[in-house]
């Protein structure tokens, strides 16, 4: 599968702000300091979306990956499993949904549903032994 987006962030000066609806997830991620064997690099917000950026230790380029949510989104993360596939998610008016990244569940609870899911990075599956 082709990688639809792959990028490395070297600029550490990018300014991010948060808003009330994301306060809980911001505090949670900051308290962990470790996001699925990676590090949270940024939690950003603009008029249209919220971005959680993190680096994964398995990536030799230490590429930053983004989860992008549009709208009022609350996340509950299953941190017991490792994220190997990262998706970009666009949410618009709707209901509660569950999204799985290679078996890692992220529950999105909001007045939004997924409008578009675009695979950014795929994990090659090992053949059965």
Q: What are these regions, as identified by a protein language model?
A:
Residues 1-129:
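Surface-exposed, interaction-prone regions used to assemble/regulate multi-protein complexes
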């Amino acid at each position: 599968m082709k990688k639809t987006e792959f990028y490395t962030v070297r600029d550490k000066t990018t300014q991010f702000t948060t808003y009330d609806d994301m306060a809980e997830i911001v505090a949670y991620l900051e308290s962990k300091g470790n996001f699925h064997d990676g590090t949270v690099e940024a939690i950003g917000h603009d008029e249209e979306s919220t971005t959680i950026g993190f680096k994964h230790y398995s990536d030799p380029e230490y590429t930053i990956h983004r989860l992008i949510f549009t709208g009022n989104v609350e996340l509950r993360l299953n941190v017991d499993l490792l994220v190997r596939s990262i998706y970009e998610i666009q949410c618009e008016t709707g209901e509660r949904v569950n999204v799985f990244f290679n078996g890692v569940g992220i529950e999105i609870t909001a007045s939004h549903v997924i409008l578009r899911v675009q695979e950014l990075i795929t994990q090659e599956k090992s053949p059965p032994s």
